[in-house]
UniProtKB/Swiss-Prot annotation:
Gene: STS-14
Listed EC numbers: 4.2.3.-, 4.2.3.7
Protein's organism: Postia placenta (strain ATCC 44394 / Madison 698-R)
Family membership: Belongs to the terpene synthase family.
Catalytic activity line of the entry: (2E,6E)-farnesyl diphosphate = pentalenene + diphosphate
Protein name in UniProt: Sesquiterpene synthase 14
Domain of life: Eukaryota
Positions that bind Mg(2+) 1: 87
GO biological process, one term: isoprenoid biosynthetic process
Length: 351
């Protein structure tokens, strides 16, 4: 018997994506400000905060909003910290508890100046401060679109918790439909829309909506390829396209990777074709819409680069894995399901 760990091959899905990597020049300064604000709440244990910091969510925001001003980038950095805190806090809870958390956050974004009650989950005050600061620099239309997208995202997090409670594994189509919301892509477009005045007729036009969902799917596929190893190790891989494809088509992991890479190519082509079908709404709106579509188009590259540049999925070996495309299968680890909220365990990956 060989002691060598099994190696997983990660297909190079982004090789032909036309948009390159950009990063905001204000990255280090704004990340430091946002992280200092976030850590001031002491949302995690010392050990989990170290693991959270290695994820470098400020880098994710700086890759996603490379042309943003310092003020707008701060909104992006704060939002990424809020997103992943929601992710960590809700991943270990049952649907009824998640519903309660989500209702707090929905109340916050609709009432950002309302003081939060004593003893409420930290999610309330952290989200309130993020949103109160964000709206100072956001157009009314971008605020409205964010509230709608963030509410859809939050409700889908409850759905994911119900699936977890019932040990329910979806079909590919059903998974992608719900995951398009709970990957958090739509609200993540908001920091790029902060200064735009896109009317609903343009923002919610079927072609634009479809393009935004194409991008969400590309993010899902690349996220699930990168996160599968960590998730199978911690026993949290039911909500992953690779697990679903393996079960639905009765194939192994290698064949599932090939299937996902092929589907990724199809979605890329849908997006590129869809861009040619954008209607005109007049010169002023068209210029803003072009800026918004560019913000969507760079997200898959952002996500792919961050998967390897941060320590979230590959520890300190991300850039090496990005080159070789091979990663050793991590051994199974036990996490303590009784540790919640501030005590939640944020897993540290070490390949």
């Amino acid at each position: 018997m060989s002691d060598q760990p099994k190696m997983i091959y990660l297909p190079e899905t982004m090789a032909n994506w036309p948009w390159p990597r950009y990063i905001n020049p204000h990255y280090e300064e704004v990340k430091a400000e946002s992280d200092a604000w976030f850590k001031g709440f002491k949302p995690f244990t010392k050990q989990s905060q170290v693991a959270f910091d290695k994820c470098d969510f400020g880098r994710l925001a700086s890759l996603a909003y490379p042309w943003a001003s310092k003020e707008h980038l701060r909104t992006g950095c704060d939002l990424m910290n809020v997103f992943f805190m929601i992710d960590e806090y809700t991943d270990v809870e049952c649907a009824s508890v998640v519903r309660g958390m989500v209702d707090i956050v929905i109340d916050v974004i609709n009432n950002p100046h309302k003081p939060r009650p004593e003893g409420e989950s930290l999610l309330g005050e952290i989200t309130r401060q993020f949103w109160e600061r964000a709206i100072k620099a956001a157009t009314p239309s971008s605020q409205k679109h964010f509230i709608e997208a963030f509410t859809d995202y939050l409700n889908s997090v409850v759905e994911q918790a119900a699936d977890r409670d019932n040990n329910h594994i979806r079909t590919v189509d059903s998974y992608l439909k719900t995951r398009r919301e709970n990957i958090g892509a739509r609200p993540s477009y908001f920091p790029a829309e902060l200064g735009l005045n896109l009317p609903d007729e343009a923002f919610y036009h079927p072609v634009v909506t479809e393009l935004s969902y194409n991008i969400a799917e590309l993010i899902i596929l690349d996220n699930d390829i990168a996160s599968y190893n960590k998730e199978q190790a911690t026993g949290d891989d039911r909500h992953n396209i690779l697990t679903i494809v393996m079960l639905q088509f009765n194939i192994d992991l290698e064949a599932a990777m090939t299937w996902v890479a092929s589907y990724h190519k199809d979605v890329e082509n849908k997006f590129l074709d869809g861009m040619k079908k954008l209607p005109s709404f007049g010169p002023v709106v068209d210029k803003e819409l072009e800026e918004y579509i560019l913000a969507l188009a760079i997200w898959p590259r952002t996500n792919d680069c961050w998967n390897f540049e941060s320590g979230r999925y590959f520890g300190s070996k991300g850039l090496q894995v990005q080159k070789t495309r091979y990663v050793p299968l991590l051994p199974k680890v036990k996490t303590d399901p009784t540790l919640k909220q501030k005590q939640v365990v944020v897993s540290l990956v070490d390949l």
